[in-house]
Amino acid sequence: VSDTGSSGGDGGGRNTGRAGRPKRTDARRNEKTLLDAAATVFVTSGVDAPVRDIAAEAGVGVGTFYRHFPTRADLIIAVYRHQVEACAEAGPALLESSATPHAALREWIGLFVDFLVTKHGLAGVLQPDSTGFETLHSYFLDRLVPVCAELLAAAAASGEIRSDVEAYALMRGVGNLCIGADSDPRYDARRLVGLLVTGLRQPH
């Protein structure tokens, strides 16, 4: 990206604004590409994955990476927020596109498990008793608990699952099942989470 500071005073504010918008759009697009790539690499290699692997996944140079995220903590927090938003937006979309509300719930819980891989990695970057960690945790709950509640309500209204399951309790249970999953190859957290979601079904 070229330096916009050399535009000079000759073109006036209007032209500079017009030229700046595409560059800001490109920067946002590059950042989103990096965040998507980092999330993918984190799931397979953990939050300590080499920067070059993330840059390669995104198809950009390491220099571009560091312009967006000077430190690993900056990257992890940005990925955390990015995945929270992606998870939140996926809920209503899955309700629209899935064959049944329970299928939407199962798919969404799978995305939530992917997110938890990144979330657990924050422990090495932010102290659990720090203000930053508490702020992110509150943000996570505020955004995702209502989405999970909407999916549960839709599945209950369709008669697929029991109606007494609380979103927070389900998410907490899924989170607990995922703890330590990346350090024990004999433990298949996804399988147990799948059994949990299946167990929500109403008996026929």
Predicted region positions:
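Helix-turn-helix/winged-helix DNA-binding modules
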Residues: 46-47, 67, 162
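Short hydrophobic/aromatic patch on the recognition helix
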Residues: 59-69
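Hydrophobic/aromatic residues within well-ordered alpha-helical segments
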Residues: 30, 83, 87, 101, ...
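Amphipathic alpha-helical packing segments from all-alpha helical-bundle domains
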Residues: 85, 118, 125, 132-160, ...
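Hydrophobic alpha-helical connector segments
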Residues: 78, 89-118, 133
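Basic, helix-initiating cap at the start of DNA-binding domains
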Residues: 1-57, 74
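Short amphipathic alpha-helical segment with a characteristic S/N-K-E followed by hydrophobic residues
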Residues: 71-76, 87
